[in-house]
Amino acid sequence: MSFLCALGIVTAVLCGIWSYLAGIAGLIGWAGFAGCTTYFACGKHGMSGVKKTVITNLTGVLCGMTIITLSKIYPLFGNLGIWCGIITFVMCIIAKSEWFDFCPGTFMGCFTTFAADGNWSVLVVSLVIGAFLGFACEYGGNWLYQAVTEKKRCNTYVGENVLQEKKEIE
């Protein structure tokens, strides 16, 4: 079994469970998937990846709520576009900081705030759980790969493994 196959199996099971539980708990299922996607995209692994995901996603939620709030306080023609422009600039500038250097994570948090219609409290919980979902998928995939192939450990992570496996096939 390839690492990608092991990761796919574990991810399918865990995401199915998340989707079911999110509905029961009144959480936003797709937002959890956004958090999970951010985890895999941020380039970090383990708790460093969770930390990077949570910091950037929640900063994005704050930016999204700022845009929504300022647009309500100053209801002028075109003000939503003006506030979006200003806050987008801020999101790009703060990416110079190591804390916020995964700018797509910040944008993910911001646009999910709009998609969740500003329901930030449920959104935040869903995004954070999604970050841990990504963590669980990655480590579960590693566990299954090791168990099936009888390797003591997987030396590489998701992106590297996929590339390595492609080279081995060629």
Stretches with model-predicted labels:
Residues 6-18, 51, 55-67, 82-91, ...:
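Hydrophobic faces of alpha-helical transmembrane segments in multi-pass integral membrane proteins
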Residues 23-28, 72-76, 96, 100, ...:
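Transmembrane helix-loop junctions in multipass membrane proteins, especially transporters and channels
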Residues 48-58, 74, 99-109, 122-131, ...:
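A cytosolic-side transmembrane-helix exit/cap motif
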Residues 27-44, 85-119:
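Pore- and pathway-forming membrane helices of multi-pass small-molecule/ion transporters and channels
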Residues 3-4, 41-53, 72-76, 115-123:
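Membrane-helix interfacial "entry" motifs
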Residues 147-170:
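Short, highly charged, low-complexity non-transmembrane loops/tails of multi-pass membrane proteins
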Residues 1-45, 123-124, 135-145, 149, ...:
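Alpha-helical transmembrane segments and their membrane-interface boundaries
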Residues 19-33, 68-85, 89:
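Structural signature of hydrophobic alpha-helical transmembrane segments
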